[in-house]
Amino acid sequence: METAHVSGVSYLTIGDYGAEFLEFLASTGAKVSVFTTSNPAAVDLGGVLTVSDEVLRGQGRIARALRALGVSVTFSCAPYDFILTRPRTFHAWAESNAITYINTFRDAWSDKNPGPLALLGAIAGFVPRTSLYTLEGRRPTASVKIDVGPLDSLEAGIVGALIGERLGSGVPYLRGASFIDEESRREFAAALSTYSSMVFAVVEGVTPNWREYLAVAELRDKIEISRDDVAGYLKDVGEPDVVYFGCPFADVDTVLWILGEVKKRGRAKRPIYVSTSPGVYKQLGDLAKAALDLNVHIFAGACLVVSPFTRRFKHIATNSLKAIFYIPRLHGVEVFPCRRERCIELAYA
């Protein structure tokens, strides 16, 4: 394997027992043998998401143990931003949205590894040759016709969720899927892997080596996704407490789009939270701090899914189907979908 990416590093999700496990591994002198990165934490790097002293201390223990193991503590769920995985290379990643992204859009090979297995694989330099590390295991098993048109970020997420709910498992082969930008590709990958066990889809004309996959496909199932299906997933929304972007982490283009839309309107009535990677945050420079004057809170290394900060809200509007799935389950907060343009409008309603 060339790289590893470790999930389950938020104190909210692994607690003291998880911290002790990482500290034990570090105490043995173990070190990762390949370039290894880490998922988001419960605490952001700039202190935007205020948390208790207990969470702060626990997250510090986890970060120190990871560093002792040689992990690059990137605290990002989008390692594909800075790891340019090549087709037909092997990786041990444990964040499902990232696995789906590199499998689908780069034909880099990773199975859905549990966080501890990815870490142990990083130390050993090897992982078990499970199905998605073989061409046989990557054979498409279902035909999916997408009759929706170019997919924006919300539509791409809904399509991913619908495929996941209808198929559940296997490898879908998509015809007619068109993603309008990078954010839509991210949201599709995140939703597909959130609403099913699938972490790989072959997109005709997009996935590297898609013709080879089509040649070996055994398409036992067949489904269609229409514009009416997508419309049926939407519902009327109320007034949110906050608007949230960045699940998965927003890239620099998305952050700049948000800031541009807000600057046109002036200070937002309701706060807009944007989670991104430390690398993108650094690129933004003074823009991140200046955004506070517009009621836009940009933070790095954490997200509203894995931070207890989220529990202070009652209603969140977002264009992320992954956030819609996880936040109610982890925090008991209502989350509803909106296209990103509509999400901006809701911040001024």
Predicted feature descriptions by range:
Residues M1-A349:
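Non-transmembrane, aqueous-exposed alpha-helical and coiled segments at domain scale
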